[in-house]
Swiss-Prot record:
Subunit (UniProt): Monomer.
Protein name: N-methyl-L-tryptophan oxidase
InterPro entries assigned to the protein according to its UniProt record, in alphabetical order: FAD-dep_OxRdtase, FAD/NAD-bd_sf, Me_Trp_Oxase_MTOX, MTOX
Keyword Flavoprotein found: yes
Keywords: FAD, Flavoprotein, Oxidoreductase
Function: Catalyzes the oxidative demethylation of N-methyl-L-tryptophan.
Family per similarity comment: Belongs to the MSOX/MTOX family. MTOX subfamily.
Keyword Oxidoreductase: yes
EC number: 1.5.3.-
Name of the gene encoding the protein in the UniProt record: solA
Binding residues for FAD: 4-34
Modified sites of kind S-8alpha-FAD cysteine: 307
Cofactors that this protein relies on: FAD
């Protein structure tokens, strides 16, 4: 049997692509080295932020707004909502370049973003402490996503629509010829007209020419109380420290508040190097500078987890065909800020398989930018 699309890596982007391509009427085979959702990549840990006024650059805003519409649609398929509109407050010095990008994106796209000075911030959320030179940009329409629930839902919907799924089965090689793409696995060879390579952190095992660096990252849950919950209207947040360190976190659930540090981490080259949480001496204390200064009412570390970022050299996404192979789309280099975009990236992959022109300007995400 020849498929229209083979998906190599069915985590966040791959799971979404499998659903949207199958829903469009294509014959699709989803593959993964593990059983998604799993803890070997970048999508585990219960929750991920979604922000609309994007501090990483205005080029992302059309993508994230389409993603939000698709998240709302996906949530309708579940009794438990996948998207929680908690709001997101972005904290940092008034002269922060990141916050300037947030404000610029909000102005250009007429997004619902409120600017709060330090006094107004601490009045609205007495649990937060910031210096006088800090501001907050509050996105009331943003919030957080239940990442593993999202992947489970996409996989179920794709399967119900007739998608073939081959999990716990690593792809060992990819072959290209005039007839399409062939993959080799322990279960045999499979053929398709087109392929999506969305293998996340370890994409270089199949495409070593891609400029992707795996980074070991950690996040942790700390003791909290009801003041920090969604019921008390406590928001999700990003926070920039005076030294430039970037943190992110979520409202407390079951008296546990999850927080992580976006920058830093350990460069790794193999799955074995991604040691579990607490294997590196700094893991448990990584969030202390932020908690001590900004959220002093939070208690001790309860537990944590390790994950991996697939960083591109400029930490912008890679969305392009594999060099020399126009029938294979690569989506990688999501650099720790990609999950919120998973549905729109999956939709882009489905359009690729349908040979449709993308609805977005993907020029900023082409591989050619690294050779200029």
């Amino acid at each position: 049997m020849k498929y229209d699309l083979i998906i190599i890596g069915s985590g966040s982007v791959g799971a979404a692509a499998g659903y949207y391509a199958t829903r469009a009427g294509l014959k699709v085979l989803m593959t993964d080295a593990h059983m998604p959702p799993h803890q070997q990549g970048s999508h585990h840990g219960d929750t991920r932020l979604i922000r609309h006024a994007y501090g990483e650059g205005e080029k992302y805003v059309p993508l994230v707004l389409r993603a939000q519409a698709l998240w709302d649609e996906l949530s309708a398929h579940n009794e438990e909502p996948i998207f929680v509109r908690s709001g997101v407050v972005n904290l940092g010095p008034a002269d922060s370049a990141f916050l300037a990008n947030v404000a610029r994106s909000a102005q250009q796209r007429q997004l619902n973003v409120e600017r709060l000075d330090a006094t107004a911030l601490m009045t609205r959320w007495p649990e937060i402490r910031v210096p006088d030179n800090y501001i907050g940009l509050f996105e009331a329409d943003s919030g957080f996503l239940r990442s593993e629930l999202a992947i489970t839902t996409w996989l179920r919907l794709a399967r119900e629509a007739g998608c073939a799924q081959l999990f716990n089965c690593p792809v060992t090689r990819i072959h290209h010829d005039d007839n399409g793409v062939t993959i080799e696995t322990g279960e045999g060879r499979y053929h398709a007209s087109r392929a999506l390579l969305s293998a996340g952190t370890w994409v270089k095992a199949l495409a070593p020419e891609l400029p992707v660096q795996p980074i070991r990252k950690v996040f942790a849950w700390f003791q909290a109380d009801g003041r920090y919950s969604v019921k008390n209207r406590f928001p999700a947040f990003t926070g920039e420290m005076p030294n430039g360190d970037q943190y992110y976190g979520f409202p407390a659930e079951n008296n546990e508040l999850k927080i992580g540090k976006h920058n830093g981490g350990q460069l790794i080259q193999s799955q074995e190097e991604r040691k579990p949480f607490a294997a590196v001496a700094s893991d448990g204390a990584e969030a202390f500078p932020f908690l001590r200064n900004v959220l002093p009412g939070i208690g001790g570390c309860l537990h944590g987890a390790a994950c991996t970022y697939d960083n591109s050299p400029d930490e912008d996404f890679i969305i392009d065909t594999l060099p020399g192979h126009e029938n294979t789309l690569v989506i990688t280099g999501l650099s720790g800020h990609g999950f919120k975009f998973a549905p729109v990236l999956g939709e882009i992959a489905a359009d690729f398989a349908l040979e449709k022109t993308p609805s977005f300007d993907l020029t900023p995400f082409r591989l050619s930018r690294f050779s200029q």
